[in-house]
């Protein structure tokens, strides 16, 4: 049995969690804050909670999940589309210096795929796909019983595939998969399809129209 702290870096919020790992994972605590354009400032807001857990539990390491592109070996983020201001941030080095624990970085979809494959619905399978749908959209691939991340850790970055020329913008690219199905894209689709926010029936009708359009383009 071991205790691990996890950092989840997202475009809308960042969170730190602690869990106990044996034959399964037990979540012991979680704390989240809004994501800002300052990586140092955002992580500082999670620092006190992390220190309290480090004092209370024999934590072995820190895991970090974040949308790509990133370099898991160097522990560095690159131009992550939904994290303006975080370009080229060396997040592993930053956390290791703060907390004096070994830290590991992984693409968020890859991290989810690994956990689901080892402990969840994918347990016992040799091939599976995990799709993340949050502020952005991505996927993690398990092929032949191993994580497949590609040459540059970007094998599952399906969110930027263009599906239509005039679709909603997904972080700079019109009509991308992420533009249609990411959190921001769905909101833009709802706005495009009409009107000001209304009651439940109006939102339901709008949602049905959106689903029909997505079905037409094969989503």
Mark where each language-model region is.
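Short glycine-aspartate micro-motif
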Residues: 2-8, 61-63, 128-132, 138-140
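Glycine/GP-enriched mid-protein hinge/lid loop-to-helix segment characteristic of carbohydrate kinases
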Residues: 17-20, 28-30, 36-42, 104-106, ...
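Anionic group-transfer/hydrolysis microenvironments
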Residues: 10, 67, 110, 134
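Short, flexible segments with low predicted structural confidence
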Residues: 66-68, 158
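Conserved phosphate-binding loops in N-terminal lobes of ATP-dependent enzymes
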Residues: 4-66, 73
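Glycine-rich phosphate-binding loop and adjoining helix at the ATP-binding site
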Residues: 40-47, 51, 60-62, 69-127
């Amino acid at each position: 049995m071991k205790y691990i702290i996890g950092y989840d870096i997202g475009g809308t919020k960042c969170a730190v969690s602690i869990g106990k790992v044996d034959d399964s994972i037990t979540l012991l605590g979680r704390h989240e804050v809004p994501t800002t354009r300052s990586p140092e400032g955002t992580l500082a807001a999670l620092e006190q909670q992390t220190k309290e857990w480090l004092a209370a539990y024999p934590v072995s390491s820190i895991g970090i999940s974040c949308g790509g592109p990133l370099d898991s070996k160097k522990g560095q983020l690159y131009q992550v589309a939904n994290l303006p201001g975080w370009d080229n941030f060396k997040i592993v080095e930053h956390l290791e210096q703060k907390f004096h624990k070994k830290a590991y970085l992984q693409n968020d979809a890859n991290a989810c795929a690994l956990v689901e494959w080892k402990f969840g619905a994918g347990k016992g399978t040799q091939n599976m796909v995990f799709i993340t749908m949050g502020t952005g959209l991505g996927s993690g691939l398990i092929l032949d019983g191993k994580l497949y991340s590609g040459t540059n850790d970007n094998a599952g970055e399906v969110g930027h595939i263009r599906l239509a020329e005039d679709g909603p913008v997904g972080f700079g690219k019109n009509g991308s998969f992420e533009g249609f199905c990411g959190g921001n894209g769905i909101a833009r689709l709802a706005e495009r399809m009409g009107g000001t926010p209304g009651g439940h029936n109006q939102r339901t009708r709008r949602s049905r129209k959106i689903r029909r359009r997505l079905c037409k383009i094969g989503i």
